[in-house]
């Protein structure tokens, strides 16, 4: 196997593993946790597994818009954006940037799978107490795909704003 083939294989395994873990976790929540109920909580209700559905996007924004507009804004546009992100990841030479882009891609694909095959919405289940920060008693419930996107974005921004600029300035 050539170096380029091995690189593509590693990318494939990384992405498929993340998407599989996201979809498996959602499958288990759907199978074992009744919609709207709390499966269990830890540390005096700090962390809970709860089964909710999100028909909107980030923090349920847009859940009220018409179904045909949702198809455009929540499925079609993200698919084009994800294709672009994936193509950037394949071309990227820097490992940190590539991983951050692949995390964003994998999370986006995980949630698009839900939008395509779960008409009642994206499965969210990770729920944390937020102690009134930003006026929130609890952080909006999310899933692993959401985490991949957020971690990928943070990694990308930290690298781009702090590490890469520091290297370029020396």
From Swiss-Prot:
Top-level taxon: Bacteria
The encoding gene: lspA
Molecular-function GO terms, alphabetical: aspartic-type endopeptidase activity
TM annotation in the entry: 9-29, 72-92, 95-117, 143-163
Pathway info: Protein modification; lipoprotein biosynthesis (signal peptide cleavage)
Main location: membrane
Protein name as annotated: Lipoprotein signal peptidase
Enzyme Commission number, as recorded: 3.4.23.36
Catalyzed reactions: Release of signal peptides from bacterial membrane prolipoproteins. Hydrolyzes -Xaa-Yaa-Zaa-|-(S,diacylglyceryl)Cys-, in which Xaa is hydrophobic (preferably Leu), and Yaa (Ala or Ser) and Zaa (Gly or Ala) have small, neutral side chains
Active-site residue numbers: 124, 146
Keyword Ribosomal protein: no
Localization per record: Cell inner membrane
Function in brief: This protein specifically catalyzes the removal of signal peptides from prolipoproteins.
Keywords: Aspartyl protease, Cell inner membrane, Cell membrane, Hydrolase, Membrane, Protease, Transmembrane, Transmembrane helix
